[in-house]
């Protein structure tokens, strides 16, 4: 299995160097490394040239934002799976890539560590639902995405901070792509890095995406459900199944009794 590791950078020389070290230090051999720099002026290009032998493709030129740069990286990728490890973010350990090779789903998602936190963040259950995504986005630093899926659902560049969330909605929820949640800690997330600058327009983008993809009544229902505790939702499912089961048993019993009476 071949991976394409893609790093987006703009004027984050120190963060870029940490990221590159974590990528080239992987013990898995079959991967390519792509760096898309947005025309940095802080010495980032010098860092890239320092590691040029380990980089498959790189470019430094102005772009139209992070998602434009990420799509640009995708266009140069040839791997089976893509992962975006943007400047400042790092692979958690040297064996991350080798630990994912047994999975074949369209999208594989692990965990991240935020800043100095010792508690992993990410999805903590096997499946994923629309409600889960209404509550939070999946960490792109921990997502391995099949290249054909990324090409089918490229990042929508009109959304400046939440296009990766739209990708998850379109691919997993609407497109019904196969999904695997794993307990592997994939990345150490730099809370001051390029991927952290998303709070300004997040809610604005999210509302616009929901309006674009779903009828208002569906959005309203799921917005309400997103604030209900998982345990309560699970209990409701069990209750519903119990009621249905009782009705089925009762109906079957009545049928048998009627059949016996006829005899």
Q: Which sequence ranges carry the predicted segments?
A:
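Cell-envelope/extracellular polymer assembly enzymes that use nucleotide-activated donors
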Residues: 1-4, 32, 166
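Glycine-rich, basic loop-to-helix element that forms the pyrophosphate-binding segment
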Residues: 19, 44, 60-77
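A conserved acidic beta->alpha catalytic loop
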Residues: 37-46, 86-90
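Short aromatic/hydrophobic "clamp" motif used to bind/position activated sugar donors
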Residues: 82
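Conserved donor NDP-sugar-binding/catalytic core segment of glycosyltransferases
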Residues: 90, 94-121
């Amino acid at each position: 299995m071949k991976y394409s590791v893609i790093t987006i950078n703009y004027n984050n020389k120190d963060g870029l160097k940490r990221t590159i070290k974590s990528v080239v230090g992987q013990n898995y051999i079959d991967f390519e490394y792509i760096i898309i720099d947005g025309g940095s002026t802080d010495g980032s290009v010098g860092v890239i040239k320092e590691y040029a032998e380990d980089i498959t493709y790189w470019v430094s030129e102005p772009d139209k934002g992070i998602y434009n740069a990420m799509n640009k990286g995708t266009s140069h990728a040839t791997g089976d799976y893509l992962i975006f490890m943007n400047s400042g973010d790092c692979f958690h350990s040297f064996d991350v890539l080798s630990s994912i090779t047994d999975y074949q789903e369209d999208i594989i998602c692990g965990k991240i560590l935020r800043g100095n936190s010792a508690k992993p963040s990410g999805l903590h259950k096997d499946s994923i639902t629309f409600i889960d995504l209404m509550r939070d986005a999946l960490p792109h630093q921990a997502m391995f995405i099949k290249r054909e899926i990324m090409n089918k659902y490229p990042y929508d560049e009109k959304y400046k901070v939440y296009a990766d969330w739209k990708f998850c909605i379109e691919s997993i929820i609407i497109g019904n792509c196969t999904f695997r949640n794993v307990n592997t800690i994939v990345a150490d997330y730099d809370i001051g890095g390029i991927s952290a600058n998303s709070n300004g327009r997040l809610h604005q983008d999210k509302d616009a995406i929901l309006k674009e993809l779903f009828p208002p009544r569906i959005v309203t229902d799921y917005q309400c459900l997103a604030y209900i505790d998982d345990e309560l939702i699970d209990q409701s499912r069990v209750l519903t199944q119990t009621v249905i089961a009782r009705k089925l048993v009762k109906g079957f019993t009545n049928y048998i009794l009627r059949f016996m009476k006829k005899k």
